[in-house]
Regions:
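A short, N-terminal "cap"/entry segment at the start of jelly-roll beta-barrel domains
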Residues: 1-36
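A generic "binding-loop/recognition-motif" signal
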Residues: 56-57, 75, 91-92, 101, ...
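Short acidic-glycine-tyrosine-enriched beta hairpin
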Residues: 75-89
Length: 113
């Protein structure tokens, strides 16, 4: 059994800036996972944005706290705690924190990359 906490050294050592706006860490990745690409947590400060980008895998953004404006291709929607957004392979997507507190999301990616 593998259990990771967001404050574990193995997680903190993976900290990176994701697409220009979010501070992200890999909770689990391909070093462990076989059928899933990764599970990451990302924090967007108010006014920050995960800039529009296209990935070669499908993803799910799940909002834990805060809120933001989620864009997938030509659709835009306000998202908040408990919302899960499916992002198909090859879709242009972005998330802007338009609230007044951090927007914290879990990102699950397929293994297609």
């Amino acid at each position: 059994m593998i259990v990771r906490h967001v404050n574990d050294k193995e997680v903190l050592d993976t900290t990176y800036l994701a697409h220009g706006g979010a501070i992200a860490q890999m909770i689990l990745d391909r070093r462990i996972l076989k059928e899933i690409g990764f599970l990451a947590i990302a924090r967007l400060a108010p006014g920050k944005e995960i800039e529009g980008h296209i990935d070669p895998m499908e993803e799910i953004y799940f909002v834990l706290s805060g809120s933001g404006e989620m864009r997938v291709d030509d659709e835009t929607r306000q998202v908040g705690p408990g919302d899960a957004t499916w992002i198909p392979v090859g879709s242009l997507h972005a998330l802007k924190n338009n609230g007044d507190e951090d927007c914290v999301i879990l990102v699950v990616a397929s293994s297609n990359w």
